[in-house]
Every structure is written in structure tokens, then in C-alpha cells.
Amino acid sequence: CILPYNRVVRDLNGLTVKAFLGALKFNFELMLMPGFPCKPVEKHCMGMYVDGQWYHLKAWPDVYEKKDVVGQLDVSILQEKVLSPVLGIEDPRTDQRISFVGGSHKAAELAELADKTGGVAFVMYPTSMEDLMKIADESKLMPPKSTWFEPKLRSGLFIHKL
């Protein structure tokens, strides 16, 4: 089963919460979801937790190129429209301010992590098997930490006959 690979960023890159939310409005429809974790139910949507509040984010249709199989992934949209330009995370592989949390963890755990540092948590919509196969068929690479698979298989369990 493919689950999302969620993100927690330790700070807002020097921005106030108001300025951070304002920057997101250029690329996303933001809806405050008071009182409960927001888990996305469709592609191009994500949940976000910042400053004690949950938000539902939906990417505006012109934010991503529909024919770009990698660029239209939610993890790509987040990286290109939020993490890099707003939060200053150019390389998520090496930036110490970002953590990746597997989809088997509850949204409340992400909120707790964000609260500890005054940061922000993103609950992603999982990459579909269809998108995964399209990317493989086109010999393209997915962004880092795009998918979380459950159950985890033990190392050495797969044997392929040559």
C-alpha cells in the first residue's frame, strides 16, 4: 500500500505566521479547519498545521503543468511552491530543518513535532500507483521521499530468478 510521506519543517524561515500564510495564497486556496487534523482526500490537496491551527490547502489549477508527470505530483508542488521559495529549503535531502514522517504516523504526531519548534507540518496526499507507473514508464525520477510503503518487507525477502 502506498502511503504519503509527510513533512515537518522546524521553522518558518523568519516569517511571521501571517506572512507565511499570505505567501501561500498565491499558489493555494487556504481553508482553516478548526479543531481537527486535516487529511487530504484528493490529489493536489494537502493538510497543513501551523501555530496551533489546521488548514486545507488546494493548489490552484495553474500552479502545476498537467502534462508533467513529475511536476504535477503533490510533493513536487510543495517543494517548488512552498519549501524552496517560501521556507528556503533548496535541497530537502540535506537541509537539517526538514523531517520526513511516514504515512503510518498520525497527523497529531506531526502537529506535536511542529509545535515543539514553532514550525509547520504538511500532511500529503499519497502518490497514486498510476502516477508511480507513469513516472517509471517515462524513466523519470520522483522527488526524494515521495512515497511510503506499508507493510515494510524485511531485507532480503525478495528473490528474483535470473
Residues covered by each model-derived region:
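Surface-exposed, charge/polar-rich loops and edge strands
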Residues: 1-162
